[in-house]
């Protein structure tokens, strides 16, 4: 099929730390009656399954998107979404591509550091401009100092087209301000700033998610 990625949003209900659980232990848990697992046991089974998902995603060249940081709504365990808890996965699966969402807010520093340290970690700043415009501006400026600019994406992560359009305006406003200030400080040429912006809003995603190849296959099927 022409799937372009897989996504994990489990930070809403559990920690992002996924232990490496053996097949034998996971099998014993899986065959237990439904509802009989403790919270710790259920986590172990989830851990095993997500490792399996990463392995399959890697086989099929599908990037793995992961919700990090701030959780929508009220009353949750914010610490669940701490980006650095994913560190063991980045070490274990160097061939996988991981795309971290939302700037990892409020842990934007470790979010950026992970992308700097690991070649297979990419950053999608989706939501960050809406959460805090000023945080988005300052964090993106820091990230551009230390992370290659072909590792950035912008996504809407919205349910309605109106929300997507509004989210795009927020994102463009933040990126334009950051790049303009970097031009004024002599850190970028205008041509390079346009290249960075095109990458963030279009070209980087096309390359990383292999959209040209997969969309062309869809069009071919439509002609048949």
Annotated model-derived regions:
Residues 1-8, 15-121, 135-153, 170-171, ...:
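Histidine/acidic residue-rich metal-binding segments in metalloenzymes
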Residues 14-15, 130:
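Short glycine-rich, flexible loops that bind phosphorylated cofactors or substrates
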Residues 76-77, 131, 166, 192:
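Alpha-helix capping and helix-loop boundary segments enriched in small/acidic/polar residues
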Residues 106, 131, 160:
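Glycine-/small-residue-rich active-site loops that bind phosphorylated ligands and cofactors
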Residues 122-133:
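His/Asp/Glu-enriched short active-site or ligand-binding loop at hydrolase and phosphoryl-transfer sites
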Residues 149-150, 166-224:
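Mid-to-C-terminal alpha-helical segments outside catalytic/metal-binding sites
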Residues 157:
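Intrinsically disordered, low-complexity polar regions and short flexible loop motifs
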Residues 161-165:
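Short active-site-adjacent structural elements
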């Amino acid at each position: 099929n022409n799937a372009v990625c897989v996504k994990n949003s489990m930070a809403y209900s559990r920690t992002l730390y996924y232990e490496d659980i053996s097949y034998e232990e996971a099998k014993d848990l899986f065959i237990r009656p439904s509802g009989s697992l403790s919270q710790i046991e259920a986590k172990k089974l989830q851990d095993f399954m997500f490792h399996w998902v990463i392995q399959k995603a890697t086989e099929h060249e599908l990037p793995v998107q992961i919700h990090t940081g701030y959780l929508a709504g009220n009353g949750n365990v914010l610490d669940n979404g701490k980006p650095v808890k994913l560190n063991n996965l980045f070490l274990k699966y160097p061939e996988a591509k991981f795309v971290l969402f939302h700037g990892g807010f409020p842990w934007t520093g470790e979010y950026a550091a992970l992308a700097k340290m690991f070649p297979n970690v990419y950053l999608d700043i989706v939501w960050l401009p809406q959460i805090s415009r000023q945080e988005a501006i300052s964090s993106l400026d820091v990230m551009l100092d230390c992370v290659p600019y072909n590792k950035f994406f912008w996504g809407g992560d919205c349910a309605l087209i109106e929300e997507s359009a509004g989210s795009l305006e927020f994102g463009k406003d933040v990126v334009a301000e950051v790049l303009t200030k970097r031009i004024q400080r002599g850190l970028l040429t205008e041509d390079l700033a346009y290249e960075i912006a095109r990458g963030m809003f279009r070209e980087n995603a096309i390359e990383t998610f292999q959209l040209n190849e997969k969309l062309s296959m869809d069009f071919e099927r439509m002609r048949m």
